[in-house]
């Protein structure tokens, strides 16, 4: 997909340029993750975890009853342990999909629906019709069933565009759970509060797990074996993540980009790693995390260069050099970009060196997406300098690329296992399927809304909010409300696509879904990537600094 043809370019000549440099906060972390590695005895944790995993496998063999099976699966998933028990869960769900739930209550029916929808089973939402009265409203007697309401609330977020009953369920359950919250006892009240802020379907698993462990340990019906395993597993993964982050921080320091000394780039290497880690935290995705983190930091440098520093002519020169992908192009660039350009080429070569011979084709896709990314940034520079405010549709065609999700997804996929990152997977991704477009839409709009106030302080390209306001003559608040409606539609598209058979590994499809979930992590109420001393810092402390007491 080509976004703009860059014309032939003249050699850059140094001139005095008056630049509007964005003032970004410096890195909070510095060398913390290089110099402050906390030693946890991993040997005993691994040994004990294996014992506990065997005990949990026995639970799957010995569990009796539909409700007990569903609760076991749900608990394991919410505690982030499901990657250890994929076969057991798949076998149990294959049995559950054929169970007649007509004689069960709201809690059980909604849990059954959610567990199956989460794994791609297209169970009908008609199962909830029996909970409506003659007027088509949810029954009054459900209003005091907090457990059933919460179960329905979380299930309803797996709805598609045609399932209006689930839209009604969200409104009904949210209103009533909010009313009941003050009268609920902990730890259930904490769980309700947590999921009212972000439903399970949109929660980053690693972040939710950290919170849920604290809730689950106070449950009167907790399983001590599962709880101990959850704590051990969290801490063992944290040890792995700390080691990876130490490597990443050392790599970033050694890279020593000249451009960083100009102080217009967001130094967010720790935040970049955390972004990648919350998408897929399992040991099997270590290489993907390392590659995607490095790529995300390069994207940040590229984005800030176009957006916050380079002139239009300099942007054109950089874009043209990237399209040619030749180190000889460095002489055409202004001095401050030369070091970055050459190191960028070297890093892509390092990515290729990380891959086995049969995997190296992936970098061809990655380079192509990088070129497209630079074209999108350049086009935005043109819009900015021309004070051009396009119609929303035109803006979205460009900005769902410039937001960087497509490139980032390609980078993460490039580092995944051979059975997942097949040639077919890359061809599917390159076709820009509906789920990729929907994920990019969510990230684009939430990014624009949370960064809107900061962007107004300097010359900037029109955002989706600006475009909507101009096209429809609305206020900022109305524009944001309407755009968030598009976000809700995009989530429903994702849900539909997760129920569609593609012939690819489900991990390929879910990777895009997990990437969209990061909006709750990065763009919930503020642009936490640009302003990291907010929720981002809190999450990094809880996920990467503080282990869970055992």
Swiss-Prot record:
InterPro entries: Isoprenoid_synthase_dom_sf, Terpene_cyclase-like_1_C, Terpene_cyclase_plant_C1, Terpene_synth_N, Terpene_synth_N_sf, Terpene_synthase-like, Terpene_synthase_metal-bd, Terpenoid_cyclase/PrenylTrfase. It catalyses: (2E,6E)-farnesyl diphosphate = (S)-beta-bisabolene + diphosphate. Its EC number is 4.2.3.55. Mg(2+) 2 binds at residues 303, 307. It comes from the Eukaryota. Sesquiterpene synthase involved in the biosynthesis of bisabolene. This is (S)-beta-bisabolene synthase. GO terms for molecular function: magnesium ion binding; terpene synthase activity. GO terms for biological process: diterpenoid biosynthetic process. The Asp-Asp-Xaa-Xaa-Asp/Glu (DDXXD/E) motif is important for the catalytic activity, presumably through binding to Mg(2+). Keywords: Lyase, Magnesium, Manganese, Metal-binding. Mg(2+) 1 binds at residues 303, 307. Mg(2+) 3 binds at residues 451, 455. A motif (DDXXD motif) lies at residues 303-307. Belongs to the terpene synthase family. Tpsa subfamily. Its cofactor is Mg(2+); Mn(2+). Expressed only in young rhizomes. Not detected in leaves, roots and mature rhizomes. The gene is TPS1. Pfam families: Terpene_synth (PF01397), Terpene_synth_C (PF03936). It is an enzyme of class 4 (lyase). Binds 3 Mg(2+) or Mn(2+) ions per subunit.
């Amino acid at each position: 997909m080509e976004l703009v043809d860059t014309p032939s370019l003249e050699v850059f000549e140094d001139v005095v340029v008056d630049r509007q440099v964005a003032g970004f906060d410096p890195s909070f972390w510095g060398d913390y993750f290089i110099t402050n590695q906390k030693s946890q005895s991993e040997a005993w944790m691994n040994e004990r975890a294996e014992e506990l995993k065997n005990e949990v496998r026995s639970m799957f063999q010995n569990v009796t009853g539909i409700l007990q099976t569903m609760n076991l699966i749900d608990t394991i998933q919410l505690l982030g342990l499901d990657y250890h028990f994929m076969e057991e869960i798949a076998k149990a769900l294959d049995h559950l999909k054929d169970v007649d739930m007509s004689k069960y209550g709201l809690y059980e029916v909604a849990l059954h629906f959610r567990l199956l929808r989460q794994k791609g089973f297209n169970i009908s939402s008609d199962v909830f019709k029996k909970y409506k009265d003659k007027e088509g409203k949810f029954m009054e007697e459900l209003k005091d069933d907090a457990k059933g309401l919460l179960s329905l609330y979380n299930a309803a977020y797996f709805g598609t565009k045609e399932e209006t009953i689930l839209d009604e369920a969200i409104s009904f359950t949210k209103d009533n759970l909010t009313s009941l919250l003050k009268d609920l006892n902990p730890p259930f009240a904490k769980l309700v509060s947590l999921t009212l802020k972000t439903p399970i379907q949109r929660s980053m698993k690693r972040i939710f797990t950290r919170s849920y462990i604290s809730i689950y340990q106070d449950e009167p019906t907790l399983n001590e074996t599962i709880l101990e395993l959850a704590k051990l597993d969290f801490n063992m993964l944290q040890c792995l993540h700390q080691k990876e982050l130490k490597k990443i921080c050392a790599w970033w320091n050694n890279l020593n980009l000249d451009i960083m000394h100009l102080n217009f780039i967001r130094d967010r290497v720790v935040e970049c790693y955390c972004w990648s880690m919350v998408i897929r935290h399992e040991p099997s995705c270590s290489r993907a995390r390392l590659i995607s983190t490095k790529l995300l930091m390069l994207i940040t440098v590229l984005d800030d260069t176009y957006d916050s520093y380079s002139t239009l002519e300099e942007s054109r020169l950089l874009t043209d050099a990237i399209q040619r992908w030749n180190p000889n192009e460095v002489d055409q660039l202004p001095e401050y970009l030369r070091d970055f350009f050459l190191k960028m080429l070297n890093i892509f070569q390092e990515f290729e060196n990380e891959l086995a011979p049969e995997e190296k084709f992936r970098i061809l896709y990655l380079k192509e997406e990088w070129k497209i990314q630079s074209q999108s940034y350049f086009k935005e520079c043109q819009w900015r300098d021309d004070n051009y405010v396009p119609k929303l549709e035109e803006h979205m065609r460009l900005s769902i690329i410039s937001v960087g999700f497509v490139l980032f997804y390609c980078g993460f996929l490039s580092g995944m296992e051979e059975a997942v990152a097949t040639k077919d997977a890359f061809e599917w991704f390159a076709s820009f399927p509906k789920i990729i477009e929907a994920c990019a839409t969510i990230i684009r709009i939430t990014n624009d809304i949370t960064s809107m106030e900061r962007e107004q302080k300097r010359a900037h390209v029109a955002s989706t909010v600006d475009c909507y306001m101009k096209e429809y003559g609305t206020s900022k608040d109305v524009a944001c409300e309407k755009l968030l409606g598009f976000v809700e539609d995009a989530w429903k598209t994702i849900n539909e696509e997760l129920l569609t058979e593609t012939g690819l590994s489900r991990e390929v499809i879910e990777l895009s879904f997990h990437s969209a979930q990061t909006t709750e992590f990065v763009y919930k109420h503020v642009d936490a990537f640009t302003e990291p001393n907010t929720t981002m810092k809190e999450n990094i402390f809880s996920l990467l600094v503080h282990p869970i007491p055992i």
